[in-house]
Amino acid sequence: MNLTPREKDKLLISMAAMVARRRLERGVKLNYPEAIALISDFVVEGARDGRPVAELMEAGAHVIGRSQVMEGVAEMIHDVQVEATFPDGTKLVTVHEPIR
């Protein structure tokens, strides 16, 4: 299988998000990379579903809460920027203060 670097990145994010979801199901708090992956995957999948940018920016801030991440992680993440493919092209989506 020949994948572009961008496709490899998307695959890694998707896999990390799957790991994060399993850890949340077990009650394990997420670390920084897991939290970023989960939020990023939410945005990428939402874009593929055709959800608008503004909706993803707002909804992305409600994917995970402070109680679901390790101490200090919420303070480390001010913005998450994801380049996602929408039906009308690729756009940069910024989720401000994603862990509340």
UniProtKB/Swiss-Prot annotation:
Coiled coil: none annotated. Induction: Repressed by ammonium. It is found in: Cytoplasm. Pfam families: Urease_gamma (PF00547). It catalyses: urea + 2 H2O + H(+) = hydrogencarbonate + 2 NH4(+). It comes from the Bacteria. GO terms for biological process: urea catabolic process. Pathway: Nitrogen metabolism; urea degradation; CO(2) and NH(3) from urea (urease route): step 1/1. GO terms for molecular function: nickel cation binding; urease activity. The keyword Cytoplasm applies. Belongs to the urease gamma subunit family. PANTHER family: UREASE. Heterotrimer of UreA (gamma), UreB (beta) and UreC (alpha) subunits. Three heterotrimers associate to form the active enzyme. This is Urease subunit gamma. The lineage of its organism: Bacteria, Pseudomonadati, Pseudomonadota, Alphaproteobacteria, Hyphomicrobiales.
